[in-house]
Amino acid sequence: MDIRAAEISAILKDQIKNFGQEAEVTEVGQVLSVGDGIARVYGLDNVQAGEMVEFENGTRGMALNLETDNVGVVIFGADREIKEGQTVKRTRAIVDAPVGKGLLGRVVDALGNPIDGKGPIQFTERKRVDVKAPGIIPRKSVNEPMATGLKAIDALIPIGRGQRELIIGDRQTGKTAIALDTILNQKPLNAQPDEKIKLYCVYVAVGQKRSTVAQFVKVLEEQGALEYSIVVAATASDPAPMQYLAPFTGCTMGEYFRDNGMHAVIIYDDLSKQAVAYRQMSLLLRRPPGREAYPGDVFYLHSRLLERAAKLNETQGAGSLTALPVIETQANDVSAYIPTNVISITDGQIFLETDLFFQGIRPAVNVGLSVSRVGSSAQTKAMKKVAGKIKGELAQYREMAAFAQFGSDLDAATQRLLNRGSRLTELLKQPQFSPLKMEEQVCVIWAGTNGYLDALPLGKVRAFEDGLLSLLRGKHADLLNTIRDTRDLSDDSAAKLKAAVEGFAKTFS
């Protein structure tokens, strides 16, 4: 066999001719100046607002200000490596995040990248982080309860699936503890096979210490709650753009469940820090400041985020996304700019007070100032029956307690009312990590409002409650099951409960 050189060279020339012709067209710009996490870029003529751009070292940024002569880009990462004169290229993609069930049990950053060291994420698809909220027609009024497992909230300030309920209070009043207990309370629901019953949880940590977030994730893991939760973390050491973006990323992950006929709850902890990060970005981008130096659109920042929590109607799959935003106040000032904004956007607020917290009333819920504007329609019949009474009695108690400080000679009726009120207040206390099921709460509150605690010394109320619950769980499980399944306290069940409580009260001393 002879090798013909001419033939081989012809073949090689033919192969080489088309090599390296796949040229890539990218629109680029140049960095004019960079500092404080903001880059001014010249060029990038056709860039869209909110588009991802990429710097030479691979760092991503987002185009926010589109001006006549330059583009203001916020940088998602450190700006140390970025120098004046470097090129910036368009990605032609608006900022998006991975969504899907593969994210459950994972901890991610504001861009959806894993930060828990458990390898890459198996996501279903990528979705834009900033999308329009559902309109009026796809929505439905809130009608299913979202149980937190806390007596003070489930009885007095009930939350429904698809509601937005604000948790507001000073630092160290137990705001995150309420959110954490709510996540832990969903464990029995998520153990069931029916997707309509499950409630997936998304926790967004904004501007918190890394140690705090690590502790939170550790508790979730120990309690077996991480498997149905997603944690999005943009900690205090992350750049402001990441802290601004994290709630939107978390919301997109939660919307995946809402739009696929499932249910999710998202906790933004906390939105004050997001507003501060957004203020920092806006001032550095030279946008005009407004009240408290926040930009004019800080209300829109929060309203467009919280409007995405919704209960959808049957034609849309009947899914829901419940939002529990957290706001930290300074010295109980609820009339500051951000707190008033978020109060006006949400469907109610749980107001936590330092004074109550230090008096040992935990959860430190101020029942007088807290409201739930739509949740009562989602309450179970059983809870409605027992909770209506406790609300009135506590309101009367608060009014009387204020007067009782001045006068010592009180008539018997007032004395009885004060006595009952203090015991009900004691009854609503609850230690952390011990959420109660709906039917258990109903029985305990029923015992309180029907006067079975009145004769007890205050210190014995907790012991009475624990004893009653263990008796009901042990010997009257059928009663608890009936209340749970019918979601109602029928006359028959009430009679059984009365017999059980009376029997227990006799033996308890």
Swiss-Prot record:
Keywords: ATP synthesis, ATP-binding, Cell inner membrane, Cell membrane, CF(1), Hydrogen ion transport, Ion transport, Membrane, Nucleotide-binding, Translocase, Transport. GO terms for molecular function: ADP binding; ATP binding; proton-transporting ATP synthase activity, rotational mechanism. It catalyses: ATP + H2O + 4 H(+)(in) = ADP + phosphate + 5 H(+)(out). ATP binds at G169, D170, R171, Q172, T173, G174, K175, T176. It is an enzyme of class 7 (translocase). Its EC number is 7.1.2.2. Coiled coil: none annotated. Pfam families: ATP-synt_ab (PF00006), ATP-synt_ab_C (PF00306), ATP-synt_ab_N (PF02874). Signal peptide: none annotated. PROSITE patterns: ATPASE_ALPHA_BETA. One of its GO terms (cellular component) is proton-transporting ATP synthase complex. It is a peripheral membrane protein. It is found in: Cell inner membrane. The record marks S370 as: Required for activity. Produces ATP from ADP in the presence of a proton gradient across the membrane. The alpha chain is a regulatory subunit. Belongs to the ATPase alpha/beta chains family. This is ATP synthase subunit alpha.
